[in-house]
């Protein structure tokens, strides 16, 4: 049948279509190191660790076209102990997005994203430099951002919410 890969805002649950895949995804992994590599032109989010812990992402470059929708840079979701440092990120959406599940799925999993440090990163272009939410139904706790440069982003640091989604930022 006709199956189509769509941008997130075009996806309709239950229809015969699918979201485009992230470039790199980890799921329920521990002790992850992503270091010194470059990424460009992902079909969707670039790096998306989910339900993982002890993650270090350092010295990477992400360069995605400014007109490409849903091409976030780094999107930890329901992760613990994440250190992102010395990264250069230019994207068509948000540079770094802290997530913890969407709506009922996030509330049911009840896994917060916590203990996140973001240091010495350069974020050029994109909607937001560091964004918390809006997919944060499982809560977000203890985020530290230091010595980062936001140049050409619509906003540097943003907390994004959505009515009815739920979630707490501490």
State each model region's role.
Residues 1-170:
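Extracellular/periplasmic carbohydrate-active domains that bind, remodel
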